Amino acid sequence: MAASLGGMFTGQPPGPPPPPPGLPGQASLLQAAPGAPRPSNSTLVDELESSFEACFASLVSQDYVNGTDQEEIRTGVDQCIQKFLDIARQTECFFLQKRLQLSVQKPDQVIKEDVSELRSELQRKDALVQKHLTKLRHWQQVLEDINVQHKKPADMPQGSLAFLEQASANIPAPLKQT
């Protein structure tokens, strides 16, 4: 499958050292094309991983802790991050090309995936609507309970003095201190 890429990433600087041997069953989906300047058993994913690790290694490097120039530290970190971003773009490009090939070779598969994504989005939104409806019903019930409580005082005596007496009856008495 990777051989069909035929020099897709030519002109790229040599990658990091290959991963340690002895990783059986490792996917070679992103294996570099013949003639590319990568090590023979390195893949885009391996390079992405090693460049990510190099970003962290440059941040915690003992060389930087021992009083190296700030500009030198910044330059080293920027280079590591730029390399990581370049390899990430290459990896994204690879997957976009595979997606394009799939859409050309099997357009019905792409439509099925789109329909599946739309269905899952509808289910997610339906669940969100149900959640909001539940909250709405709860608050409607709270408001209804408040309205019922305010309608009950109609049988109480009218007037400002009666209202103050009723309001003060609901205030707890102060505790006596000894």
UniProtKB/Swiss-Prot annotation:
Subcellular location: Nucleus; Cytoplasm; Membrane
Cellular component GO terms held in the UniProt record: core mediator complex; cortical actin cytoskeleton; cytoskeleton; mediator complex; membrane; nucleoplasm; nucleus
Span list, region Disordered: 1-43
Keywords carried by this UniProt record: Actin-binding, Activator, Coiled coil, Cytoplasm, Membrane, Nucleus, Transcription, Transcription regulation
Entry's Gene Ontology molecular function annotations: actin binding
An example Gene Ontology biological process: positive regulation of transcription elongation by RNA polymerase II
Biased composition (Pro residues): 13-23
Matches recorded under InterPro entries: Mediator_Med28 (IPR021640)
Keyword Membrane appears in the UniProt entry: yes
Coiled coil segments of this chain: 109-145
Primary location: nucleus
Assigned protein family: Belongs to the Mediator complex subunit 28 family.
Function: Component of the Mediator complex, a coactivator involved in the regulated transcription of nearly all RNA polymerase II-dependent genes. Mediator functions as a bridge to convey information from gene-specific regulatory proteins to the basal RNA polymerase II transcription machinery. Mediator is recruited to promoters by direct interactions with regulatory proteins and serves as a scaffold for the assembly of a functional preinitiation complex with RNA polymerase II and the general transcription factors.
Subunit-structure text: Component of the Mediator complex, which is composed of MED1, MED4, MED6, MED7, MED8, MED9, MED10, MED11, MED12, MED13, MED13L, MED14, MED15, MED16, MED17, MED18, MED19, MED20, MED21, MED22, MED23, MED24, MED25, MED26, MED27, MED29, MED30, MED31, CCNC, CDK8 and CDC2L6/CDK11. The MED12, MED13, CCNC and CDK8 subunits form a distinct module termed the CDK8 module. Mediator containing the CDK8 module is less active than Mediator lacking this module in supporting transcriptional activation.
Name of the molecule in the record: Mediator of RNA polymerase II transcription subunit 28
Species: Mus musculus (Mouse)
Lineage: Eukaryota, Metazoa, Chordata, Craniata, Vertebrata
